[in-house]
Amino acid sequence: MTKKYSLGFVGRKAGMSRVFTEDGRSIPVTLIEATPNRIAQIKTVETDGYSAVQVTVGARRAALVNKPEAGHFAKAKVEAGRGLWEFRVEDAQLGDFAVGGEVKADIFEVGQIVDVQGVTKGKGFQGTIKRHNFRMGDATHGNSLSHRAPGSLGQRQTPGRVFPGKKMSGHMGAVQQSTQNLEVVKVDVERGLIAVRGAVPGAAGGDVIVRPASKA
C-alpha cells in the first residue's frame, strides 16, 4: 500500500485548559500556539529525489545562527527561526506552496482528527518500578534488601550475558513521542491557537508537530 503524505504544522505547547459544549459538558484541551510557519525550501523529485516542504517558525538571535543556516534563510528571504522542520507531501501538492510563503493554522478544521508529536518530559535516572511499572517486593516478611530491586537479569553461564532490551534502570523521558487520533476542538487563526482534545507529549513551551492522523 502506498503511503499518503500530507502537510503538517509546527507549534508550541502552551498548556492545558477546558472548553464547555452547548449541553454543559467539560472537554479537556491542550492549547497549541500556532504562529504561521514560514516556508524555507521546496524539495522536488527532480532536485532532491522526493517532494517535501521545509518550514521554520519563531525567531532566533543572529548570533546563534551559523553561516550555512544564515545563507539558507537569506536565500529563501525568510527570518531565521528556532529550527527547521520538513514535511513530505504529494507531488501534486507542491504547486500550492512557494518559498517565502506561510502555512497557517487554517490547514486544520474543527472536528478533524490529528496526531501530535513532541518530546516527553525528562525524568532523569529512574528505577524499574517508575520506568517500567515493575511490582515492588514485600515490605516485610523477611525482605530487608530487595524492596525495589528488579530481580534476576538472566540465566547462568549459558548464555552468560544479559540480553539486549532487558528492562533495567536508566534514563527516563526526553524522547520523541506521538499521541494519535486527537480531535481538533477549535482553530483560532487570528490569535494563533489550536485546541486539541486531550493531552499531548512534553512540557509547556515545547515544540510540537501537528499532522493529519495517519490511522483515522
Curated annotation (Swiss-Prot):
The record's section on SUPFAM superfamilies has: Translation proteins
The keyword rRNA-binding is annotated on this UniProt entry: yes
The processes (GO biological process) annotated in the record are: translation
Q: Name one GO molecular function term.
A: rRNA binding
Q: Which Pfam families match?
A: Ribosomal_L3 (PF00297)
Q: What's one GO-annotated cellular component? A: cytosolic large ribosomal subunit
Q: Which domain of life is it from?
A: Bacteria
Q: Where is the PTM N5-methylglutamine found along the chain?
A: 157
> Which PROSITE patterns does its entry note?
RIBOSOMAL_L3
Q: Which UniProt keywords apply?
A: Methylation, Ribonucleoprotein, Ribosomal protein, RNA-binding, rRNA-binding
Q: Which InterPro entries match?
A: Ribosomal_uL3, Ribosomal_uL3_bac/org-type, Ribosomal_uL3_CS, Transl_B-barrel_sf
Q: Provide the record's note on post-translational modification.
A: Methylated by PrmB.
State the family it belongs to: Belongs to the universal ribosomal protein uL3 family.
**What does the record note on quaternary structure?**
Part of the 50S ribosomal subunit. Forms a cluster with proteins L14 and L19.
Question: What is this protein for, i.e. what is its function?
Answer: One of the primary rRNA binding proteins, it binds directly near the 3'-end of the 23S rRNA, where it nucleates assembly of the 50S subunit.
| Annotated protein name in UniProt | Large ribosomal subunit protein uL3
Q: Which organism is it from?
A: Stenotrophomonas maltophilia (strain K279a)
